[in-house]
Amino acid sequence: MTANNANKKHLLVLGTASHVGKSAIVTALCRIFSADHKVAPFKAQNMSLNSWITVDGKEIGIAQAIQAKAAGVEPTADMNPVLLKPKGDRVSQVILLGEPYADKSAGAYYDSIEETHDVLKGALKRLEAEYDLIVMEGAGGAAEINLYDRDIVNIGTARITDAPIILVGDIERGGVFASLYGTIQLLPEDVRKNVRGLIINKFRGDPAILESGLTELEELTGIPVLGVMPYFKLRIPSEDSVSIGDKSADDGEHYDVDIAVIRLTRISNFTDFEPLEHMAKVRYVDLSDDLGNPDAIIIPGTKNTTSDLNDLVESGMADKIKSFYGMVPILGICGGYQMLGKSIVDSGIEGGESARLDGLGLLDIETVFDAYEKRTVQVTKTVKESGPIFDSIKGEDVKGYEIHMGISSSKRPVFGDDGCADDSGLVIGTYLHGLFDNVNIRRALISYLLEKKGLEFKEEEIPDKDPYDELADVARENLDMNKIYGMIGLEPEKV
């Protein structure tokens, strides 16, 4: 346990594998505990291309930003001290305490793991000084026995804090009893002794059918099952691109507007487009697929603009996109904005080797990568006159955040000094992530697309209930919260 944290409370949520629902469970617990306590989320190391920028310009995984929001506190870099952003070719950009540190292979990263260990200890200590409860999340499967000697996010966090542990398994994948039991058996003894409860997640159907299995699992492990969480559609931003596969092909079929988002190989921050799912059918189109007949096309952000531009061209998707030029809006966000330009000049910062690439040529910009520097900032911009799509909201403010390397020149900005539009105003690029979180932007885009089809705009379908309260209520209904409070040493929630 870290120094001077004897009076601080910790809870660690581990999983049997990736995508079992650890982040959602932590989010629910953060909202529940925040009713009576000052709570902070923590994940020592996150690997994700969906990230968030804090108010002081630090980059963290979006899951920890979501969890902080659920807890009612401001996200900070200490909540996710290490963020790994895969770039391809077994190399990731390492973000330490919200700042770009270096591009490293897995081997090089683990060679310096002791230094990283010190970073997370410092982050935890600072959180302990400010919060009275820290709800921590592991990564992937907890029982990665080949990594025990250098793991910082599961075994490392467990040993540093000596926290009570909840282990989560995903029944939707099948084999949940074996995965829970096997994970427990493979954990080191000093960690295994702190596993105080089990959760089965994403169950469809009547949980009564599981009762005999739950009883036997408890007898085999000596660990209580805290509950069975039902499968339901979360209304909080997704953590990583694995979640794209959860989006049904039938989602949004009842909407009149069809938006095609290009699923780049290294797609990042696709959460940008989830707000549009309340107003349109949003499809993620693989590079090898046909675009169909979209009302708008969006090229999203990417962790590696040059590599994904090459993939876009070689797959033929670039030509497919250009075939819609002048017919439907074509929007580019961050790396997608860079690809829409005339050219990209890379000194080796982005792609590893110096190169000059032709872009799609739909915007009059050139992007230059000449320094290992990243712009990370929250911004407020004013909508400028840029064409028919956003003409109805000219002069209004929009908020967003920037996460990018490279500098783009533009003679016709769209949002303050940001972005670029072509002469028709139908091709627009911007560095603003979170653009469609702005109600005025969503309404302007969807209204324009509906008007083109001779249809009337309808207000978006958003349930009245706060999505974090909704998730917390599902947890309260299906988990033994008294046991969870008890394992931490806290009084149950005051109702």
Swiss-Prot record:
Keywords: Cobalamin biosynthesis, Glutamine amidotransferase. The keyword Metal-binding does not apply. PROSITE patterns: GATASE_COBBQ. GO terms for biological process: cobalamin biosynthetic process. The active site is at C334 (nucleophile), H433. Residues 256-441 form the GATase cobBQ-type domain. Pathway: Cofactor biosynthesis; adenosylcobalamin biosynthesis. GO terms for molecular function: ABC-type vitamin B12 transporter activity; catalytic activity. Catalyzes amidations at positions B, D, E, and G on adenosylcobyrinic A,C-diamide. NH(2) groups are provided by glutamine, and one molecule of ATP is hydrogenolyzed for each amidation. HAMAP family: CobQ. Belongs to the CobB/CobQ family. CobQ subfamily. This is Probable cobyric acid synthase. It comes from Methanococcoides burtonii (strain DSM 6242 / NBRC 107633 / OCM 468 / ACE-M).
